[in-house]
Amino acid sequence: MTSYNFKTQTSFPLLLSISFFFLLLLNKVNSTGSLSFSFPKFAPNQPYLIFQRDALVTSTGVLQLTNVVNGVPSGKSLGRALYAAPFQIWDSTTGNVASFVTSFSFIIQAPNPTTTADGLAFFLAPVDTQPLDVGGMLGIFKDGYFNKSNQIVAVEFDTFSNIHFDPKGRHMGINVNSIVSIKTVPWNWTNGEVANVFISYEASTKSLTASLVYPSLETSFIVHAIVDVKDVLPEWVRFGFSATTGIDKGYVQTNDVLSWSFESNLPGGNSVASVKNAGLSTYAA
């Protein structure tokens, strides 16, 4: 288990203040392009989500990203769930960039807390994004090398330290075009506990911040980096979750998302494509 210093944690009330501040920023933007949704829980065959590989929604309304058989998580599993409508993250005509906030809750539970793998990520990628490698690649990368053509920004919640591209111990990280994070902080994962996550991107400062709170512990873990999404991402993207379990026997965990909300503003833009034209007939119930 990784040790922590005070700089990696902050109080729960402070986290709420940070969250409220970014919500105010979004509400003050005069914008014709916005996207807002909330899933307090999920529904099987959710019409506004694209499910890839092992991802599904259970009868209890949980977004189960990786495979579970008879209550036991499977190895070598990969699942992703994306918001179906393409999202305009920046405007090529005006040069404007969207600010956004997203929050979600998840549970990672492992039969053996000493052999967890591999993790869960929130990510933005090209509209035609498809699942890539299992295990440490978290389903969003195909190798450990930086590649500008990947056009991916992600926040990872990594439960297994891969020697070639991870820091020691479980960690949160911000990834730009590579599984090697540009910034990480140690993360004191708690087996089977609900984690509440808040991620914000402020376009004017290019500031990407992710916070994770275990409500029962009233502490949080925060990672922050400067990311120019206009330089990294295409104008239109899809976004959502990806998760994997380990390749080696016994290195498994559940990767379950309980709820999800998102809000964005793009000054002068469209922000989101018409749901009618987003290809939802393929995924609708």
Curated annotation (Swiss-Prot):
Tissue specificity statement from the Swiss-Prot or TrEMBL entry: Strong expression in seed. Lower levels in the flower, and the bark of the roots. No expression in leaf. The lectin accumulates in the inner bark in autumn.
Signal peptide (from-to): 1-31
Superkingdom classification of source: Eukaryota
Glycosylation sites: 147, 188
Binding site for Ca(2+): 158, 160, 162, 166
InterPro entries: ConA-like_dom_sf (IPR013320), L-lectin (IPR016363), Lectin_LegA_CS (IPR000985), Lectin_legB_Mn/Ca_BS (IPR019825), Legume_lectin_dom (IPR001220), Leguminous_Lectin (IPR050258)
One MF annotation (Gene Ontology) recorded for this entry: carbohydrate binding
Positions annotated to bind Mn(2+): 156, 158, 166, 171
Keyword terms of this UniProt record: Calcium, Glycoprotein, Lectin, Manganese, Metal-binding, Signal
Family: Belongs to the leguminous lectin family.
Function (record text): N-acetyl-D-galactosamine specific lectin. Bark lectins are storage protein that probably maintains stocks of nitrogen during dormant period. Self-aggregatable molecules that can bind their own carbohydrate side chains. They could also play a role in the plant's defense against phytophagous invertebrates or herbivorous higher animals.
Subunit structure comment from the entry: RPbAI is composed of two polypeptides, A and B, that associate into five different tetrameric isolectins. The A4 combination is the only one devoid of agglutination activity. Isoform B4 displays maximal agglutination activity.
Name of protein: Bark agglutinin I polypeptide A
Organism: Robinia pseudoacacia
